[in-house]
Every structure is written in C-alpha cells, then in structure tokens.
C-alpha cells in the first residue's frame, strides 16, 4: 500500500542518517538494503548489500539477498526483452555470464553456511536457467537432504528429471511435492502419465 511505501522511504532516510554516522556498520547498511528492496529500488539495494559485504565479508545473508535481487533483475530484464522482441520476430536471451555473479554469491553463502537450504535451492534454479541440469539436480538433492519437507525442491527436481527424459523419477518427485502441499504437481503428473515414458 501507499502507506507502507511511505514508511519504507522514511526508514531509508533514517537509516541513511545512521549510516552517515557509522559508515562501516554492516547491520545498518543491510537494514537499508531491505527497505530499498521492499520499494523495488533494486540497484540501491544491491549497492548497500555490496557495502555490507565490504564491511563484513562473513555476512552470509547479504550475499544471499544480493543473489536473490540480481536473479529478480535478470528475470525482469528477460521478460521485458521477450516482450519487446516478440513483435519483431527476434528472441534475445541472457548469457550464462549474466548468472555468474548470482552463482558466485550463492557459492559464498554455501561456503559460509553449508546447511543453508535455500542457497542450494536457489543455486539449482540458477543452474536450470543456465541449462546446467546435472548441477541443478545435485543442488536439489542437497536441498532435499537438508530439508526433506521442501516441496518446491521436489517439484523443481521432478520437472528437471522429466526434462531430461527421466519421467519415472520426475513423477516420483512431483508426487512427493504434492504430498507436501504443492498441489499443482498433480496436474503435471497427470499430463506426463497420459504420455508413454
């Protein structure tokens, strides 16, 4: 709502004043990055996260949030390019190098906090975007090993298996995702069980 946006902008102003007083305080920079993110000022959010990391290189959630925001920026850019180029008969795509910064941040999160499930899950999603399905499967496996109730990991791993032609494994994962509450998995199962494997 407009009231929430106004509150976040006021918070940005307050946090900016606090940062002027303590420019090397990682927590203050991180806090402001969250406000920038919530008002969708992604460039300033990324800049504050970078400054947070420069102040404290072990601030794992700053690496994670920066990866999440950069991924959102790429997805937004990709959707915009697809829309703009759809009328021209051309299709532009993002390069693997566009995803490298994201993957490096997630690698750092995993280095700092090896059991942070969402780092593996998000890195798997980035690997899928880069058409590196084997790496994606390994990261989905690790995410599920850490949290066996992560329905989205089963769902995405199932889709990846199906894409690679492993329908039986894919359907097993989709079924598990459905059991865990991701009910749209059942629609996907129905589509693929109507086909021959």
Language-model regions, residue ranges each:
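Alpha-helical tetratricopeptide repeat
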Residues: 1-197
């Amino acid at each position: 709502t407009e009231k929430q946006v106004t509150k976040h902008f006021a918070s940005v102003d307050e946090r900016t004043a606090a940062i002027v007083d303590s420019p090397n305080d990682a927590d203050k920079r991180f806090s402001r990055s969250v406000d920038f993110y919530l008002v969708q000022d992604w460039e300033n959010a990324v800049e504050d996260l970078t400054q947070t990391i420069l102040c404290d290189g072990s601030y794992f959630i700053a690496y994670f949030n920066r990866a999440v925001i950069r991924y959102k920026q790429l997805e937004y850019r990709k959707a915009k390019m697809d829309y703009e180029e759809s009328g021209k008969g051309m299709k532009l795509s993002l390069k693997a190098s566009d995803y490298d910064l994201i993957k490096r941040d997630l690698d750092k999160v995993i280095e700092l906090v090896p059991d942070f499930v969402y780092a593996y899950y998000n890195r798997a999603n980035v690997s899928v975007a880069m058409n590196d399905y084997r790496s994606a499967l390994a990261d989905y496996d690790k995410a599920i090993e850490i949290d066996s109730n992560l329905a989205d990991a089963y769902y995405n791993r199932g889709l990846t298996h199906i894409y690679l032609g492993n329908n039986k494994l894919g359907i097993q994962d989709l079924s598990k995702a459905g059991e865990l509450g991701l009910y749209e998995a059942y629609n996907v199962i129905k589509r693929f069980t109507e086909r021959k494997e």
